[in-house]
Amino acid sequence: MIRYNLTEFFKLSAALNYQLSVSNDLSWNILRIILGDVKLSQEQHDIMLDALSYLNHAYKDQHRRMGPLSVLHPLRATAILSRTVEKVNMLDLLTELLHDKHEDINVSNYPEDKYGKDYYQQLEKEFDHFLYKNDPNDNWYLMERLDLLSRKGEESYFTYIGRLMNRARQTPELVRVKLADRLDNTLDLHSEFYDPIEHTDFFAELFHILYIKNYQPPEPEVQHPIRHPLYGAYRLYQLFKNAVLMSIIRRRQSMSHDAAAQPLLEQLIRASMEEAQRVIIHIFNYHLKDVELQRRLLLDTMDYCQKGGMLEITRPGNRSRLDGLFMNYFEYGSAEEHKQKLDMLYKDKPLMIQTALAFVTIFKNFLLDPNYYIEGIHETGFHPREGL
């Protein structure tokens, strides 16, 4: 089983992107990359190729916020699923490949001035042709899963994940599909090939800051990266989404319905913890270089965590700047408010450090304690205890 750190993620992305660049169609070579060791019949291979052709036409020249082709996301997520979960079947693979169909492939995304007349209708005909060749029973379950995996209108992320986990008792494979989706999204937050995690012993660096009185950190090996759309506060928000997903999974005991997905959960936990570490290393290297300030932030956050601050949702208060952290910066009522809150967090580098340290603690708890989850996270939102 491959451990998907950032390096392995880039290798997978490069292999898929190379195949996309040498052919206008999603080829048999791409299917082999996706399947890994999964064995399919010739008929199933042909159906998978039809699904890939549909995705190729549906995503066409569309790009993700970071810049890569949009079609890479479902391809990578499916490859991660097939290489991480011990036993996957045809329905699992098709569900992962098409999990964003209802959100990404709708008539509003294909304006006539860009795609020509009736392009969306042609896509729907191609999808119907794919369904016609597939097993009718699988089609029923596939369409049900795709509907369940789609957020409905203004549905909050809490409600969406809660609804998915409610259904996991009947359809346990939803857990593995969502975990593979989130693992790919978590790893897809960077374009720079240099990964500070591979060049810095994170916990040794914290030890030096805390215990060596006149410690002088080495200069960073590379210049400050150019800011890109997925800036630090946005990446912290993605970690918040992972913490919500993991907490609801743990609280609902959803992994008991799909124990084979446990390696995916562990990989998502590790990827999330490492992303929080990257945020800290970056800010210490380029923005807050005063070791005394770094030490104060570490000690203050450590004290807050040791007193149980990261065990449950808290309201804003005077105990610490971390009181009410999730409610203050990650809860929002509109897209504009969401952006404003993340911009506020981004400008407050000391709080970003403490937030990232809190996430390192949260994900370490998830890794070490199989019963850990953040109290107060429910499908209806945040519910802190009275007095907190």
How would you label these PLM feature ranges?
Residues I2-L388:
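Active-site helical microenvironments for divalent-metal-assisted chemistry
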